[in-house]
Amino acid sequence: MEHQVIFFQGTDISPAAHLAFAQAFGEIDEPHPIYPSVDGFDRIVKLENNSDVPPDTNSWHTDLTYKRVQPFASILVARSIPELGGDTLWSSLYAAYDRLPKGMKSDLAGLEAIHDLGDFRNTFSDSSTNTPSEDRLNDALPRFGHQVRPLVDHHPVTGRPFLNFNEAFVTHISGLTTNESNSLRVWLANHMNRPEVQIRWRWQAGDIAMWDNRVTMHYAVADYYPAYRCMNRVTVVHDRRVPN
C-alpha cells in the first residue's frame, strides 16, 4: 500500500485480460448506472468522447461514493488517445489530510459528509445517446440515493487517516448550516486542488492506471475536445485483504 496509483505503460491488454486482471484483486462492480459498457463485457465501462460526445466529468471526483459500498479500486486502460491533451490527474487524500492545519483536523473530526448521485446532474452534458442522459440519471437516482460518510476516515488496511471528501458528489456537511457547509466544501476543494498532493499522467494507447479509490480523487482533463478519446474502466468493489 505504499503507492496510491500505479501505471503500466504500452500494454496490448485485451478486454478479457483487463477483466481477469481486475478479478485477481476482488469482486467486480455491477454495470455502471449511467455510462455504456464495452460490447460483450458489461462490467467494463466504456468512456468514449468525440465531437458529438463531449467530455462530461470535468471535475475532481472519487468514483461511486454515493453507493453503499465504496469501491476499493479502479483499473483504467487507454484505448485511443488524442494527439494533445486528455491527461488524468490524481490527488492524494492521505496527503490532503496530512497538510491540514492542526486546528482544522480537530474541527473536521466527527463531521460527516453526504455523498449524493443527484449532484452528478450538474457535471455532465446531454448531447448524444452515448453521453449520460437525463433519463438514465433519473432512473439511477432511486436505486442509489445518498450515503453519509465521515469527513476524516481511516484506511482499512494501513490505518492511516485520510480526508474523505469528494468534490463531485458531496452535497452537504451534516450538522452545519447551508452557508457553513458550502463554505467548508469550497475550502476543502481548494485545499485538495494543490500540486503538492497531485500526480499527472500523460496517456499513451495501451497504458494502464490502477488506483486505490478509497484514498484518491482523480480528474480527467477535458482539454482535447473535439478530438477522440476512448478509455475502458473496471471497478473492483471489495479488497480481498479486508474481511467482509
Q: What kind of region is each of these model predictions?
A:
Residues M1-I208, N213-N244:
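Non-heme Fe(II) oxygenase catalytic core, chiefly the N-lobe of the double-stranded beta-helix
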